[in-house]
Regions:
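Conserved strand-to-helix beginnings and helix N-cap segments that scaffold or border functional pockets
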Residues: 21-24, 58-64, 145, 182-186, ...
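Active-site beta-loop-alpha junctions enriched in small/polar residues
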Residues: 11-15, 49-53, 83-86, 134-138, ...
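N-terminal pre-domain/capping segments
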Residues: 1-127, 154-157, 207-216
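Short, solvent-exposed polar/charged micro-motifs at secondary-structure junctions
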Residues: 54-59, 89-93, 182-184, 224-226, ...
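Active-site acidic/histidine proton-transfer and metal-coordination neighborhood
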Residues: 92-214, 224-225
C-alpha cells in the first residue's frame, strides 16, 4: 500500500514457511486473507521473507514468471524482501543461529545476491526494491570485520549492476539490533566509518556503498537501546547514511521490580527466539 510518497508492506516472516512451495501456499492463503481484511480492492504490498532454500527454488525453471503473474492477478506487489533469516525460522531453536551464516561467509553473499536477482524483477520501478539483512554478524562471534567489509562491498557491486540493468533503485539494509555486530546509533555510525576507511585503504570507489547499502531501521530494536527514534534517524541521515527500510515493531516496557510484570514476561524465556532485554 502506498501512503503519500512511502510504501507500507505486510511482512510474511511471521508465517512458518521454508520451501518455495510452503511460502507460496502462505501467500495464497494467510496473506491474501490479511489483504482482504485491511486493503480489500486496493493494491497490496507484500514484504516477502525467503529462506535460502526458497530463494533458490524460486529462481528455478519458470517459478519467478509464475509468481509475477500471480502478483498481477491478485493486485499485489513486492518491493522488499526480508533476507535476515537464512535458514529455518520457525519450529526449531533459532536464537543466535539466525545470524548464521554471517557476512564473513560466502554463502551469505550468494544468498543475498539471489534475493536481489529476485527483487530486481519483482519490484515496481516507482518504488525500487530493498533487501534487509543482519548487521554483519553476532557480537559474540568475534567476526573478522575485514571479511564483512569485503563481502558487503562485493554485494554492493552486484546491486549496482542490477540497478543499472533494470533502471530501478535497489539497496541493501543492514539491521542493527541488540547483540548484533553493531546495535545502536553510535555503533552504526562507527561501523560505517570503519567501512568507508577500509574502502579507502583498498583504493575502492565508495559510491556503491553510499548508493546501495544503508540501514534497515527496526523501531523495536532501537527502542531497546533507548535511542529516540526521531533523533536517531536524524543523526543517521545527517551522517549521509541511507535509510533503506523501516520495520514498524514494538518493544515491551515494564517495571523489573514488579512481580506481576516479571511473571507476565516469563513465557518469553523460551528456546526458539532471542528476546533481548535491556
Amino acid at each position: 500500500m502506498k501512503f503519500e510518497s512511502h510504501h507500507l508492506a505486510y511482512c510474511t516472516n511471521i508465517h512458518p514457511a521454508e520451501s518455495w512451495t510452503e511460502t507460496f501456499h502462505v501467500l495464497k492463503t494467510d496473506v491474501l486473507a490479511v489483504r482482504d481484511r485491511v486493503a480489500s480492492g486496493k493494491k497490496f504490498a507484500i514484504g516477502l521473507r525467503l529462506s535460502a532454500q526458497a530463494a533458490l527454488e524460486l529462481l528455478e525453471n519458470d517459478q519467478l514468471d509464475q509468481f509475477e503473474s500471480w502478483l498481477a492477478q491478485e493486485n499485489c506487489y513486492v518491493f522488499t524482501i526480508n533476507g535476515f533469516p537464512y535458514g529455518a525460522f520457525h519450529g526449531t531453536r533459532v536464537k543466535e543461529n539466525v545470524y548464521k551464516p554471517d557476512w564473513t561467509h560466502m554463502s551469505r553473499l550468494v544468498y543475498t545476491e539471489q534475493l536481489f536477482t529476485i527483487i530486481s524483477r519483482l519490484c515496481p520501478a516507482e518504488s525500487g526494491g530493498s533487501v534487509s539483512t543482519l548487521p554483519g554478524s553476532f557480537k559474540e562471534f568475534g567476526a573478522d570485520e575485514n571479511l564483512i567489509f569485503a563481502n558487503l562491498y562485493s554485494c554492493a557491486l552486484t546491486i549496482e549492476t542490477l540497478a543499472k540493468e533494470t533502471g530501478k533503485d535497489l539497496h541493501l539494509g543492514l539491521e542493527p539490533e541488540p547483540l548484533g555486530h553493531f546495535e545502536n546509533t553510535e555503533e552504526t555510525l562507527a561501523f560505517f566509518e570503519r567501512f568507508f576507511a577500509w574502502c579507502g585503504s583498498e583504493k575502492l570507489d565508495p559510491n556503491p556503498i553510499k548508493n546501495h547499502i544503508g540501514i534497515n531501521y527496526d523501531t523495536c530494536h532501537f527502542a531497546l537501546e533507548f535511542n529516540d527514534c526521531h533523533q536517531s534517524l536524524r543523526t543517521l541521515t545527517e551522517a549521509g547514511l541511507r535509510i533503506s527500510k523501516i520495520h514498524l515493531s514494538n518493544a515491551l516496557s515494564f517495571d523489573p521490580q514488579n512481580p506481576k510484570a516479571l511473571e507476565a514476561i516469563r513465557p518469553f524465556d523460551e528456546p526458539t527466539y532471542l528476546h533481548q532485554v535491556i
